[in-house]
Amino acid sequence: MFNKKYILYDIIKENEYKIWRSIIMPRIVARGIKKEDLKKVSTELFDTIAKIIDRPRGAFTLDLVESVAILDGEEISRANIEIGWVARPVEVCEKVANAVGEIIKPLGYETVMVSFKSIDLAYEFTFTK
């Protein structure tokens, strides 16, 4: 039988777990948005989300995956923001999604999609030099 608690504490010492978790969450991945647009709003994005979830800005990561959305052979203007973190209540997700939408929508994208991905730290491994 799988015991998540055992695995977590077996991989990461209990006193290091909270520190490690706070360093890497949340992870934001943006697609379908211009690099210059994302750079323009990155500070506001971090500040806004940090305030809502009470996390230090230094715990965030932000990556841009350049992509183009296509519908019926035509490019469409759609920004897709994915936030990966340890699961939070739907009310928190709604609040963050609304705030992110308010920040991205004025940039002129027809559609702004915000989604959340729950990360189970028992299945995550980080390798460094």
Where do the PLM segments sit?
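Short, Lys/Arg-enriched N-terminal segments with co-localized hydrophobic residues
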Residues: 3-24
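Interaction-mediating elements
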Residues: 24-129
